[in-house]
Regions:
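Divalent metal-binding segments
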Residues: 1-184
């Protein structure tokens, strides 16, 4: 269900198209709310270049933004997100990760590779009500496709959303929910 709240960046043929999709999403968000997207792949773009924070800053000046690459191993963020996370030219690369920096100024470009945790730690966790809405959106999509049962392996917090919806009589699909070992 979380993916229904993200900006879909898949199959875009240009950075211009990506920016248009992001701009549409900004309209429905309040000031300072995070804008999160997933699926960009610069190899599919006409521009054939990696994006930078500047490509987001002019269209999202007031909201922190994080766009996850199609592979899931890199993120593209704007200046507001870097500021929220305290990432500067002096921030060292995390173990096993990299914060891309401009070779001339040393400032972060807005690309982080294998270093998503630096930014994600500053994104507020969804409330129980948020998680319930995510489940309901996913359930509606599944039912539209004729799917009446699902398997999921998510945290105890996600299970709480399923349990609450079941207690409210709103869960219409059968759910086989696995918990990660850390939640046992």
């Amino acid at each position: 269900g979380r993916s229904f709240q993200m900006v879909n960046l898949r199959h875009a043929s240009s950075l211009v198209e990506i920016r248009e999709r992001i701009q549409k999403a900004v309209v429905s968000r309040g000031p300072s709310q995070w804008i999160i997207g997933r699926g960009w792949n610069h190899y599919q773009w006409a521009e054939q270049r990696e994006p930078t924070r500047k490509d987001l800053d002019d269209i999202i000046p007031n909201n922190p933004a994080m766009m996850v690459r199609a592979c899931g191993h890199s993120i593209w963020v704007n200046t507001a997100a870097l500021e929220r996370a305290g990432v500067t030219s002096r921030t060292p690369n995390p173990a096993g990760g990299q914060i891309d920096k401009d070779p001339d100024s040393g400032e972060p470009t807005g690309l982080l590779r294998e270093a998503q945790d630096i930014i994600e730690a500053h994104i507020p966790s969804p409330t129980l009500e948020d998680r319930k809405q995510m489940v309901l959106a996913a359930q509606e999509d599944a039912l539209r496709s004729g799917i009446t049962g699902v398997h999921t392996c998510e945290s105890l917090k996600e299970w709480e959303a399923f349990a609450a919806l079941e207690a409210e009589g709103k869960l219409k699909v059968r759910v086989y929910h696995l918990l990660p070992p850390d939640d046992l």
